[in-house]
Amino acid sequence: MTDPRQASGGMNVALITVNADEATVLCVSEIAAQMRWNLIQSAFDYYFSVDKRPYFTQKAIDAEACLAIVDFDKDPKLALETVAFLSSSFYHKIAIVGLSSAANPDLVLESMRAGCNDFLDKPLEAEAFTDTLNRLDTLWSSIVARPLHAGRIISFFGAKGGVGTT
């Protein structure tokens, strides 16, 4: 079985932008396209919650890694809920970068507690975002891929106690 990264030249990364303006989405897309990744892009113009769930394509769900860019400027409370939702939806394979034009230390701390891996200032500086992507690429490249189904659990239930099913 061949590794999909070797066959296609790079790992499959889902790039999700949440409530970001067009200029930010364009900047993020252009910089991420320079990485050696196969990008699966999704742009959402609303925050996520339990009541308002997004639709992710199957390719985005099956991607080896996910990168979410969440803009905190419009509604920080809903942005925090979105970060928590993404963290639980893509458990252990997502990196979340928060963006805000206001450098509020309390907001940065709350976003990190909710699941953000990094927090950058708006307007997005290409050099800072490239450094973040390079760190993530190094991290994701060092993780050894495991098969999805590594084992099987078989359990037996006896009809009544004392029949030797242990």
Predicted regions and their residues:
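The C-terminal output helix
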Residues: 135-146
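Alpha4-beta5-alpha5 "output face"
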Residues: 109-113
